[in-house]
A protein has these predicted regions:
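Rossmann-like dinucleotide-binding cores of NAD(P)H-dependent redox enzymes
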Residues: 1-67, 127-134, 142-176
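Hydrophobic alpha-helical segments, especially N-terminal targeting/anchoring helices
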Residues: 12, 62, 98, 106, ...
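Residue-level structural signal for beta-strand termini and adjacent loop
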Residues: 24, 53, 118, 223-224
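Short, surface-exposed charged micro-motifs
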Residues: 49, 95, 109, 208-210
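Short acidic-glycine loop/turn motifs at beta-strand connectors
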Residues: 54, 100, 213-215
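FAD-site-proximal beta/loop scaffold in flavoenzymes
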Residues: 69-146
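Flexible, glycine-rich terminal cap/loop adjacent to redox cofactors
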Residues: 145-146, 162-281
């Protein structure tokens, strides 16, 4: 946003990449599209000091390898995330257990250890997302109204980076599968083969689905491109329903749309996609 308004930017990130949680191949597309927006992108770097001077704000950096550097800026925006306020709202005075970090533990009905007190949203733990909180609130309201069967039992919760292009992912990521040794089948459909993406002039993205190598059930998916956040809900539904690559691939998607790339990614995994040349084995 600041770059769009004409500001020159340096971005500092202590970890080894932006958008932690998303697969690196998704982020790579975003980074390539936005490289021109940054004068510097300093990864594995932390800010160790800032001092107001006559020329501006002098900021000191230190890399994880011990290297040191400085920069002078007109403005500094520090994004430090959020911390739960469980210890600040007096919940413990009502008998509610509050964890050491300030989170409040709840059961599947969003009850705290005090049966008539419920907690939802960021204060009950990760992921700190509004759409998760809304579903938790529904459960809490239903239980408080007398529904003894209501539970928060979502298998997956989608995440979206509302950037340009958008990055969205849900369920198991490819990086997680590799780290955990889970064997998966991948179906990746590049938007360079999407008629709608080409017509939009935005074919830089792709849609990726991951399936269990044996059962062929979908485990996760990621999308990078315009309106990725609008599309990821279908992948979440497929995971919740236990769909496999045939279920998704045989579902007729409207053409030409970006959404049909989900069906085509499933076809790629199945080996039946006719919109791409055959994959070499």
């Amino acid at each position: 946003m600041y770059s769009t308004l004409g500001a020159k930017l340096d971005v500092v990130e202590m970890l080894d990449g932006l958008m932690q949680g998303a697969d690196r191949d998704l982020v790579k597309v975003w980074q390539k599209m936005n490289a021109h927006r940054f004068d510097k992108l300093m990864l594995k770097t932390k800010t160790v000091g800032a001092e107001a001077t006559a020329d501006g704000i002098k900021v000191s950096f230190e890399g994880l390898d011990g290297s040191k550097s400085e920069g002078v800026y007109d403005l500094v925006l520090q994004a430090v995330g959020r911390t739960p306020n469980g210890k600040k709202i007096g919940a413990d005075k009502a008998g509610v257990i509050v964890g050491d970090r300030g989170f409040i533990p709840v059961d599947v009905q969003m009850r705290t250890n005090v049966p008539h007190i419920f907690a939802i949203g960021d204060i009950v733990g990760q992921p700190m997302l509004a759409h998760k909180a809304v579903h938790e609130a529904h459960v809490a309201a239903e239980v408080a109204s007398g529904d003894t069967k209501a539970q928060f039992d979502a298998r997956v919760i989608p995440s979206v980076a509302y950037t340009d292009p958008e990055v969205a992912w849900v369920g198991l990521t490819e990086d997680e599968a590799k780290a955990k040794g889970i064997k998966v089948k991948k179906g990746l459909f590049p938007w360079t083969a999407s008629g709608r993406a080409i017509a939009n002039g935005r074919d830089e993205g792709f849609t990726k689905l991951l399936f269990d190598a044996e059962s062929h059930q979908i485990l996760g998916g990621g999308i990078v491109g315009t309106h990725a956040g609008d599309m990821i809900g279908e992948v979440a539904l497929a995971i919740e329903m236990g769909a496999d690559e045939v279920d998704i691939g045989k579902t007729i998607h409207p053409h030409p749309t970006l959404g049909e790339s989900i069906g085509m990614a499933a076809e790629v995994a199945h080996g039946s996609c006719t919109d791409l040349p055959p994959q070499r084995k």
